[in-house]
């Protein structure tokens, strides 16, 4: 009964969302496809259902591994199911700590994490025998202080946090879960989420370009007051909240319906693109002066 209620609730919410975004006719057709199992949304719903039904399990154990890293080569992360944090360390060696939670014990946890050099890049992730064996996985990756050529991170269900690091290029994709960057700098950044919030927090800076897109979720952008930009935004259903003093706004469409526009500040040397199919976009500022 509980599972049925959960399923109906999810379908109802999705039906409302699709109706708002695409109209009653398209929304009804998509819901019928979901019920028939033929929609692209089915995989996403299965992930959400699995995440909910797992609940919180007992602590099963943890693994720790060290690995060499070369800042001149790309770092690539791939996790189907995990809350991932990428952090800086004053140490010269890189490491990955993983904590596992579940309802039943799992043999040989030490065989799950991997750090492999392939095609000129460092690949980090987990070889999970069965996602259903775990209720939660937390991953902490520590990288020595340096400017890395590139970071490419993919997370299926979970979250991604990157803090106090520097990159040439940074690209992330999270299907279900939030993405947050703190005190991080990069030449170019692209953040994508299917269902989840995107946050670019105080202290994070971009030299050339920043792109943030979520299908369902909010976008929060904190920008340094001295960094000139030209920002293009588009919102399917939601509103723009601009608290960046001095930014010139050009908006088309109503505040609560489909809208798009541009904001500019300073020399406009940095390109920013923000889009949310369903969700709000918030823009704030911070000072780099001490």
Positions of predicted regions on the chain:
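Short acidic/polar N-terminal linker immediately downstream of export determinants
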Residues: 2-108, 130-144, 180, 247-269, ...
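Short, T/G/N/S-enriched strand-turn elements that build extracellular solenoid repeat scaffolds
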Residues: 63-67, 83-90, 111-114, 138-143, ...
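Active-site alpha-helical segments that house and flank conserved acidic catalytic motifs
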Residues: 75-79, 153, 172, 233
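Hydrophobic residues embedded in beta-strands of well-ordered beta-sheets
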Residues: 94, 120-122, 240, 281
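Short beta-strand/loop motifs in extracellular/secreted proteins, especially
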Residues: 94, 149, 229
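Short, surface-exposed interaction patches in beta-rich subdomains
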Residues: 183-184, 188-290
């Amino acid at each position: 009964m509980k599972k049925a209620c959960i399923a109906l609730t999810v379908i109802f919410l999705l039906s409302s969302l699709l109706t708002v975004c695409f109209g009653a006719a398209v929304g009804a057709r998509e819901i019928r496809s979901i019920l028939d199992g033929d929609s692209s949304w089915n995989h996403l719903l299965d992930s959400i259902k699995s995440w909910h039904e797992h609940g919180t399990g007992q602590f099963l154990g943890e693994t720790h591994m060290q690995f060499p890293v070369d800042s001149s080569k790309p770092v690539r992360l791939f996790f189907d199911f995990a809350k991932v944090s990428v952090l800086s360390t004053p140490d010269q060696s890189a490491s990955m700590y993983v904590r596992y939670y579940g309802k039943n014990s799992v043999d040989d946890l030490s065989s799950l994490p991997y750090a492999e050099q392939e095609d000129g890049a460092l690949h980090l992730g987990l070889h999970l025998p069965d996602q259903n064996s775990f209720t939660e996985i937390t991953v902490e990756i520590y990288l020595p202080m340096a400017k890395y050529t590139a970071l490419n991170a993919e997370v299926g269900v979970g979250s991604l946090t990157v803090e106090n690091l520097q990159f040439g290029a940074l690209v992330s994709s999270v299907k279900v879960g939030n993405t947050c960057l703190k005190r991080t700098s990069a030449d170019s950044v692209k953040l994508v989420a299917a269902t989840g919030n995107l946050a670019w927090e105080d202290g994070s800076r971009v030299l050339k370009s920043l792109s943030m897109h979520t299908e369902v979720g909010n976008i929060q952008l904190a920008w340094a007051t001295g960094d000139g930009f030209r920002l293009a935004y588009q919102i399917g259903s939601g509103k723009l909240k601009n608290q960046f003093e001095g930014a010139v706004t050009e908006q088309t469409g109503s505040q609560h319906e489909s809208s798009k526009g541009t904001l500019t500040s300073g020399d406009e040397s940095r390109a920013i693109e923000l889009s949310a199919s369903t969700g709000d976009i918030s823009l704030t500022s911070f000072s780099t002066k001490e």
